[in-house]
Amino acid sequence: MECGDVQALVIDNGSSISKAGFAGDDAPRAVFPSIVGRQRYRDVMVGMGQKDSYVGDEAQSKRGILNLKYPIERGIITNWDDMEKIWHHTFYNELRVAPEEHPIHLTLSPSSSKANREKMTQIMFETFSNPAMYISIQSALSLYASGLTTGIVIDSGDGVSHTVPILEGHSINHAISRLDLAGNDLTDYLGKLLSGRGYPFISIDETEIVRDIKEKLSYITLDFQNEIKIVSSALEKSYELPDGKVISIGNELFRCPEALFQPSFLGMESAGIHETTYNSIMKCDVDIRKDLYDNVVLSGGTTMFPGIADRMNKELTALAPSTMKIKIIAPPERKYSVWIGGSMLSSLSTFQQMWISKEEYDESGPSIVHRKCF
């Protein structure tokens, strides 16, 4: 089967959010939570015609009566049965397609194991009977989305952050840095800061409120030490809760994302994202460092804070040699740039020979993925 004849599907499964759609589109058609919910009181519910499990938005809306599970933790698939449910839901409920009719382009975290890559390949061919598939490292796709093939990507979603140097489309594996600090950690931290202000947010519903406050009002300051000296009331912003009550929030709004640069705020000993970026560049060949400093690409929802690009520029300038030109690229659509890069790549005519076909899989088994994709 010629993959160019039928539209490929592009699926980017994140720790919290899955993005799915059709190759060649400029945005995903479906964006939904990467969750599977099961009844807490199974015997009663199933007898009343309730389903055994729910996925995505439906699971989210029924969370009061369900136990919710995230099959992807810190960017890595840890529960394959639930992951299959998410893929099934993606094909049949969200995109309404037959998976056996479309090539599938999937994405993976840079720190996923060889075994995970093989398992993903096996499920696509054996469970969903895909005619062809391909797996890309997420950060490389973000780079393509910015029209680049060489640069360093700072990719931070809800579960994990990575700094990934890429040369001519290939990630430089020994120089990748991983930081287990991302959006969910910042949401938890903001919740603690707000509790200290006398607004305790405890339940799952309230965690969603904290996430919303973070996404709508938080920002990164250029000079944290200076900003923290300003009287908090001068920085206050108001937020209306679902019940109509209005609360005021001050320096918590920039103290929360400051943890990206100072993980010690969360009790972590790791370097901040500026230092991990610098460390990744320093692990690369001296000849390509200039190209990396000149193409620092931000990717993922946790890089959406206002002020992040200026702060990153300031911090990297302080670390890098003084002769180095530093350019931070922060595309406005970077929340979805992994998916967008996958969509662009899958629709190129030159990409059509890259797919792993069902015939190749039947001949070589799951290990074909390492030869063709990585």
From Swiss-Prot:
An example Gene Ontology biological process: phagocytosis
Which sequence ranges are marked TM in the entry? none
Give the matching Gene3D superfamilies.
3.30.420.40, Actin, Chain A, domain 4 (3.90.640.10)
Question: What InterPro entries does its record include?
Answer: Actin, Actin_CS, ATPase_NBD
| Domain of life of the native organism | Eukaryota
Which protein, by its recorded name, is this? Actin-17
The entry's family comment says: Belongs to the actin family.
